[in-house]
């Protein structure tokens, strides 16, 4: 598993995980190939590549190709992160989850719930700087695709406790 900071940086962009998984599968790729394979717009792909370069996980291949057709390769620091992304993407496909079904905070949330069940306030504290609205929407989407379960404690007032379902534990196992 990668560190919490790397996981947050990785999930900051919707396409960073699929992009790194593709780069790991192909051992590098050209811009045009990534555009076609992932079906992204040029601006989204350029922004995603810039974010990966800023993280130090990706570089332009200095000894290849024409400047207008750049190729990108993983750095040594990017290889373990890309391997992590491959595992997540493989498990996502097994679970038949579309990219839109895993919102930005879903992977950090699964990593947190892998340790133990938690209340909303504990999740919010662990996932800072998440907003209450973002956490609520993420939990709602994760409940809809059966990755997270919600149980109510028998107290007054009732307290919601969130935990992983079997599908959620399978995805968490791919993240370890």
Regions inferred by a protein language model and the residue ranges of each:
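A short, conserved structural fragment
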Residues: 53-63, 143-153
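N-terminal helix-turn-helix DNA-binding core of bacterial DNA-binding proteins
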Residues: 2-44, 99-134
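Histidine- and aromatic-rich ligand-binding microenvironments
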Residues: 66, 90-98, 152-156, 176
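Short, Lys/Arg-enriched N-terminal segment that forms or immediately precedes the first helix
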Residues: 1-9, 79-98
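Residues within the DNA-recognition helix of helix-turn-helix
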Residues: 48, 138
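Basic, amphipathic "hinge/linker" alpha-helix immediately C-terminal to the N-terminal HTH DNA-binding motif
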Residues: 64-86, 156-175
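Transmembrane alpha-helices
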Residues: 34, 45, 76, 84-85, ...
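Amphipathic alpha-helical recognition patches that constitute DNA-binding helices
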Residues: 69, 73, 96, 108, ...
């Amino acid at each position: 598993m990668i560190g919490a900071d790397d996981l947050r940086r990785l999930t900051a962009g919707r396409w960073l995980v699929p992009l790194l998984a593709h780069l790991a599968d192909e051992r590098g790729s050209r811009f045009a190939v990534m555009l076609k394979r992932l079906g992204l717009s040029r601006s989204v792909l350029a922004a995603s590549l810039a974010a990966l370069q800023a993280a130090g996980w990706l570089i332009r291949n200095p000894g290849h190709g024409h400047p207008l057709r750049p190729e990108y390769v993983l750095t040594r620091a990017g290889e373990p992160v890309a391997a992590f992304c491959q595992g997540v993407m493989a498990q996502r496909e097994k679970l038949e989850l579309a990219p839109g079904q895993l919102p930005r905070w879903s992977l950090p949330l699964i990593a947190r719930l892998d340790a133990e069940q938690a209340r909303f306030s504990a999740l919010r504290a662990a996932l800072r700087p998440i907003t209450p609205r973002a956490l609520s929407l993420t939990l709602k989407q994760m409940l809809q695709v059966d990755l997270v379960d919600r149980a109510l404690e028998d107290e007054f007032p009732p307290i919601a406790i969130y935990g992983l379902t079997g599908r959620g534990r399978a995805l968490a196992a791919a993240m370890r």
